[in-house]
Regions:
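Asp-based phosphoryl-transfer active-site loop
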Residues: 3-17
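Active-site phosphate-binding/coordination module
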Residues: 22-123
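Hydrophobic packing residues within well-ordered alpha-helices of enzyme cores
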Residues: 24, 49-53, 166, 170, ...
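Conserved acidic, metal-coordinating active-site core of Asp-based
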Residues: 98, 102-218
């Protein structure tokens, strides 16, 4: 019996227009009415989730959201932080050094801000900030490492070819010290070592006394893989890559074909 539904957002809950289909909203409410806990698990920061949570009609209910690819978990009744992993000042210095050696730009997140280091934000950073409903805050390395802000996650953004080059040159080295993932063609993400959506979900499941066998997780991208494998039932979206699909227990329709609603109807309702 499924007791917890873990949902990725971009490419899963959201369609390509970055909207939540009504079929998804209806199915999610039906699952919650059956007693299933909803946990959105996303690479987005908290401020990039809030408007969608309100659209779901669940604002201030006692559910949970895992953001920043597992770096922080919030309880939605008051949006308090219940679990987190953060980057140290030396981590940030290391990430900054990698960005300086490449053509990608480093960004950082705390609970309230989308920070950009290394000068004016490039076009890809600007576009990403719009997607998460955020203004950009330019910050120096000295400010970023001052300890005044709790920095959860670093992201390197550039064109697809620039991000390819960054990944080829630095991913092997970076992943010895961080959890790194190419979440999108233009984004490479770095979290504290051992931090994924799955590790955050595992800790939350312990708090809620829910076994992994009672969890259904849905996603489409590389940063969803650990979560799909951790859950008792891991479902890949129809728009996922063949690689992600090969690691899932089942495949549903795409995010343009109400794939989340179809899976909820099949496995929960």
């Amino acid at each position: 019996m499924i007791k917890l539904l873990a949902l990725d957002m971009d490419g899963t809950l959201l369609n390509e227009a970055k909207e939540i289909p009504q079929a998804h909203i209806t199915a999610i409410h039906q699952a919650i009415e059956k007693g299933v806990k909803l946990v959105l698990c996303t690479g987005r920061p908290r401020f990039g989730v809030l408007p969608y949570y309100k659209k779901l009609g669940l604002d201030l209910q006692n559910e949970y959201v895992i953001v920043n690819n597992g770096c922080s978990t919030h309880q939605t009744s008051d949006w308090s932080l219940v679990d987190w992993q953060e980057l140290s000042p030396s981590d940030i210095e290391y990430l900054y050094d990698l960005a300086e050696k490449s053509d990608v730009q480093l960004t950082l997140f705390d609970e309230e801000h989308y920070f950009v280091l290394g000068g004016k934000p490039n076009e890809i950073v600007q576009n990403d900030a719009k997607l998460v409903f955020s203004d950009l805050t330019e910050i120096s390395l000295e400010e970023a490492t001052s300890g005044k802000c709790r920095m959860f996650q670093g992201m390197f953004l550039g064109t697809e070819s620039q991000t390819d080059d960054f990944e080829q040159r630095f991913a092997g080295e970076l992943c010895q010290r961080f959890s790194g993932v190419r979440s999108q063609p233009v984004i490479y993400e770095a979290m504290p070592l051992g931090t994924t959506k799955a590790t955050a979900l595992s800790r939350l499941a312990e708090i809620l006394k829910i076994d992994s066998s009672e969890i259904m997780a849905m996603g489409d991208a590389n940063n969803d893989i650990e979560m799909l494998q951790f859950a008792g039932l891991g479902i890949a979206m129809g728009n996922a890559s063949d690689y992600v699909k090969s690691l899932a227990d089942a495949v549903t329709a795409s995010n343009e074909e109400d794939g989340v609603a179809r899976a909820i109807e099949k496995y929960i309702l």
